[in-house]
Every structure is written in C-alpha cells, then in structure tokens.
C-alpha cells in the first residue's frame, strides 16, 4: 500500500458560537464513528475555541495512506459546511510530485459566502470595481472575513488605492497571521513605499507559509531577491535568485517570462560581490534568453558584461541607493 506526503494549510471562520460547536461535534462524530480515528488531524489540534475558528498553519505529514487522506479531507469538508468564511488547501504528493490537490471553501447560500465568491470571480475577470462592491458586502456580513479583506486588498492595489490596500492586508493578517497571500500583498505596498526592509519581512513569512509547488513561492523568492539587490545585500540576493534561475516554469505559470530578468539581477548581485566570473556567466545567460516580461535592452546587458570583464565594480553597486540599480522593471508584475 502506497504512502503519500500530505501538506495542508488554511482556516475556517464560523459566524457564531453555535456554528462552531456544531462543526466541532460533527468532526468528532465522523472521526470516531465513521472513520474509527483513521485521520491525521485531531480536533483539539485544529479547533480554536477562543477564536471560534479552525486554524491549520502549514501542516506536513510525511507518510499517510490513501484511506487516511480521504477520511481526513472528508471530515474537513463536513466542517466547512458550517463555516462562513475561509479556505483550506490540501496537497497529496508522491516522489515530490502533486498527484492530487483539493481546495475546500464555504459554498453555501449565506450572503457573506455568495458575495465573496462573486467578488472572487470578478477579480479573476479583472472587473475590479464590481469585485470591490461584492467584497465590501462580504465584509459587511462577516467582519472577520480574512479572504475577502485579502482579495479586496489586491483590488485596491490594482486601483492604486495603496492606503486602502494596506488596511485590507493588515485586517486579513490579524484574522489569519499565516496567510501567505495577505503577507505577499502587504509586501507589495511596502515596495511602493520604498520600505524594502519591511517588504522582505513579509516575503519571509510568505515563504514560510507557502510551498515550492505554488507559483507564489517562486514569485516571492524572485522579488525578495530583487529587494535585497536594491538594498545592496548581494549575498542574500544571490541566495534567493539562484534557485529561481534553475527552475523551469510552464507558460501558464505567472512566473513564466521572467528568467532573463532573474539572470540579469543575479549577474548584478555577483558584480556587487566582486565575483566577476560568475557575474559574466549570469549576464551571458541573460543575453542568450529571449525577451520576456522585463523591459531590459541588449544595451543594458552588454553594458554590465563590459563592466564585469573590466574587473571593476560600478559606483552604484558600491553605494546602492533605491533607484540606482536597474532591475529589469516592471518591478511588481
């Protein structure tokens, strides 16, 4: 019988104490009677009595049977029926590859749920103003709707309402401190404010609460590396950018099209470290790649190759200031 590596993360919010207690009772009943305790999550480890929610920060089980996986997911789906907000992601992996992914989120007829789901669909279609109205309604119905705050934060960011975006991301993080999406969004606002140190802190939390099988993990490493580069923290930039440079992204992945920029910035970081050999290798690699989503020119790359071959560190790398180092914008795409 095959065993699988299981990763779960998420949160369910309940509208009141009664809903929470019913969810808890149903979970315990299914675990005890239906599944004979053949699950890998005990209620006392995931039900937060003080906050009336189910909290599962990133949880990893190295060896779980197919049956235990199915039982646990089924029990969590039962819990979700009583929730008004939240979501849970579950991955089943074999030999490092995802063979099943489940996203569990409320889908009932309550107005808070339907308003959020509508807002989520509208966000995906780029209808930001209509999405904001729907998410406003979801938040009015459920003040602890972390997912609605997070989605509205991204809408406000795209509408360039950066102060409102920061408010939304902060509210989402208060309810769910383990939300990788909310920390990622807040980091973007910090970058707009040129507060790269705070952005890096949020990116660190994003990495802690995401996994390499998610696009957000690699996008975070790429942009975090860029922040380190801007601050002149070249060793840290190299540490983040090397794994991204080695990764192959499929066209449907939003990380696709950024590899030339990654190699260019990696070359800059090596140049700042006075590692001219590796700088030349990275920059030549960038030169050989086709144009992607960056706005780099051939002259940008050739100019740095010339500097690296001269064995001299340009002044902008010796005394880095925000804006002095060209990173291959658009920075926040």
Which residues are covered by each model-predicted region?
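Alpha-helical segment of the N-proximal tetratricopeptide repeat
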Residues: 105-161, 167
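Structural marker of alpha-solenoid helical repeat scaffolds
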Residues: 141, 175, 209-213, 247, ...
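Helix-start (N-cap) detector for alpha-helical repeat units in TPR-like alpha-solenoids
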Residues: 112, 146-147, 180-181, 214-218, ...
